[in-house]
């Protein structure tokens, strides 16, 4: 009898959750667009007169970093500017890039590593949860790995939360995905 009640309560809980509207907050970088931007940047670097003999290169390392290398700091800054222009044209947000220190390489050449931020770090996720709670919105916010899920019975609450987060500077590009309504 008690097991049947617990099972029925579990079914009711699932039904109640199914009536909630929800969306996920993510921060992803489209790696294919990054590759395309790197290819375009390399093409422009090869064609530019001031960078022709600079031995500049841009490489994608795995799915989480870009390696820049050039003959000097001036050339590296020019390469970085070209890459940033191409990334913006391809729709990749510069907020998701973290620049490493300039490192000396062989001879006079220098290199720099740029990390791509994939997912929402835990401290940023906690900040998002705190923002929603402080706004006194009737919504449940949960951290699921590198994603934050927001659910509420009222769609207008979810729209207000999206507007609140878009209006805030979080230090990384947020995307709102998996919007589910009933």
Can you annotate each of these PLM segments?
Residues 49-56, 94-100, 125-137:
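Short amphipathic beta-strand starts and helix->beta connectors
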Residues 21, 54-56, 62-64, 95, ...:
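A generic structural signal for short beta-strands and their flanking turns/coil linkers
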Residues 28, 32-35, 43, 47-55, ...:
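Short Lys/Arg-rich amphipathic alpha-helical segments
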Residues 28-37, 116-122:
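Short, surface-exposed ligand-recognition loops at beta-strand->loop->(often short) alpha-helix junctions
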Residues 61-73, 144-154:
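Short glycine/threonine-rich beta-strand-turn micro-motifs
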Residues 75-113:
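Helix-adjacent hinge/juxtasegments
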Residues 1-16:
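Short, Lys/Arg-enriched N-terminal segments with co-localized hydrophobic residues
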Residues 18-19, 23, 111-182:
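Positively charged, low-complexity, intrinsically disordered RNA-binding extensions
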């Amino acid at each position: 009898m008690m097991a049947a009640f617990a099972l029925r309560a579990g079914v009711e809980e699932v039904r109640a959750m199914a009536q909630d509207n929800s969306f996920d907050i993510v921060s992803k970088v489209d790696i294919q667009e990054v590759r395309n931007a790197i290819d375009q940047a390399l093409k422009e670097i090869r064609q530019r007169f001031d960078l022709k003999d600079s031995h500049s290169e841009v490489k994608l390392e795995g799915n989480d970093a870009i390696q820049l290398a050039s003959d000097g700091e001036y050339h590296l800054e020019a390469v970085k500017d070209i890459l940033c222009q191409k990334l913006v044209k391809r729709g990749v947000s510069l907020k998701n890039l973290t620049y490493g220190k300039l490192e000396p390489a062989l001879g006079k050449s220098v290199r720099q590593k740029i990390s791509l931020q994939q997912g929402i770090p835990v401290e940023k996720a906690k900040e998002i949860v705190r923002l929603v709670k402080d706004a006194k919105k009737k919504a449940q916010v949960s951290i699921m790995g590198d994603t934050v899920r927001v659910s509420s019975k009222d769609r207008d609450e979810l729209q207000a939360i999206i507007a609140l987060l878009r209006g805030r500077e979080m230090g990384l590009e947020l995307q709102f995905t998996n919007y589910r309504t009933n």
